[in-house]
C-alpha cells in the first residue's frame, strides 16, 4: 500500500453499456461472479447497499454519496467469522477491515471500459499494509472472472 492508500488498479474492457456496468456494481449476483469462493449475497437497500458471502467471510458494499455517473465509489466492509443473520450493523461491528473501491466507467465502442481501483485498506481505522497485500493478491485474480461473468450477463 502506498502512502496515499493506493493498493491496486485494473482496466477491464467490457462488452456491455456503461449504465449496465453501474447497475452491476451494486448487484449481488454480479459481485459474486468474481467474489472469492462465493456462497450467497443479498440486498440491504436497493441501489445503495448489498452483501456477499464467501468462504472467508461476508462483505457489505455501500455506494457512497461521492459517486458520480463516471465513477461509483464503494465502501467495502468485510467481517471474517460472522454468522447470520447479516445486517449492516452486525457487519460494521464485526469488521475485520474496510476499503474503498472506485469503479470508473467510460463508454468505448459498443461497450465500456471499467477502471477499478482498490484503496484505503483499514483495520481498526488504521492503515494495514499486511491486509493491503492480501487485498492486492485477491484483486489481481478478479478481472478475468468479472469480465466473463458481466459480459455473459450483459
Language-model region placement:
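Hydrophobic ligand-binding cavity/cleft-lining segments
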Residues: 1-45
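Residue-level signal for alpha-helical context at structural boundaries
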Residues: 38-40, 49, 82, 153
